[in-house]
Design a protein with these regions (language model features):
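Membrane-anchoring alpha-helices and their flanking helix-loop junctions
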Residues: 1-112, 116-119, 137-194
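Solvent-exposed interhelical
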Residues: 115-126, 130-131
Length: 194
């Protein structure tokens, strides 16, 4: 039991590390352009979100009642396996979506004039598969590792919804005929639902 639990935990952590390294490297090859002040505002928002998340995680980690709850309730093999499965599916979705969008990927705050409408790969079914993949990864981590991640899932969901709406406004302006048609036949985050 202990070995499976540890393997699941290390698998989830390893996927997060691979995701961060891949994203950092892939960011070097995106199209440049757009409003730099918007990029700075977006970066400030992400930094604030990151600081709040880390502060909350540190606070919860130091809380003895939280720590006891975490180990009593959330450290089971079925939950760890379920969490690892969610993280794996989420990572696969995010990687596939990132590959499909290619050089068009970038910060939601940067509105590039040479943006292309990508409707292939996972974008054929959902409009924001990277956000969906990351939310699946966060949900899996909260199920398999720690309930503190639920706070992260809630904050990230709010941020992703805000970013998705902003991106959709831009894409509607950029592709006034094609994007509304694409939007009508796809869902925002969850195929056939949302």
């Amino acid at each position: 039991m202990g070995v499976i639990l540890k393997l699941c935990h290390w698998w989830m952590i390893a996927l997060w590390v691979v995701m961060m390294v891949y994203w950092a490297i892939a960011a070097l090859f995106v199209k440049r352009g757009g409003d730099r002040s918007a990029l700075r505002r977006g970066m400030r928002m992400r930094l604030l979100l990151f600081v709040v998340i880390i502060a909350t995680m540190v606070f919860l980690r130091r809380s003895s009642s939280f720590h006891a709850l975490q180990w009593a309730v959330f450290q089971s093999v079925p939950l760890a396996v379920t969490g690892a499965a969610f993280v794996t599916v989420g990572a696969a979705l995010a990687f596939t979506a990132r590959a499909a969008i290619g050089r068009n990927w970038g910060s939601p705050a940067v509105r590039k004039s040479d943006t292309e409408l990508v409707t292939s790969g996972p974008y054929k079914v959902i409009r924001h598969p990277i956000y969906s993949g990351l939310l699946l990864m966060m949900t899996g981590t909260s199920i398999g590792l720690s309930p503190a991640w639920w706070f992260v899932v809630i904050l990230a969901s709010l941020y992703f919804l805000r970013s998705a709406r902003s991106e959709e406004e831009f894409m509607t302006e950029r592709f006034p005929e094609a994007y509304p048609a694409y939007r009508a036949r796809t869902k925002m985050l969850v195929p056939f639902l949302i």
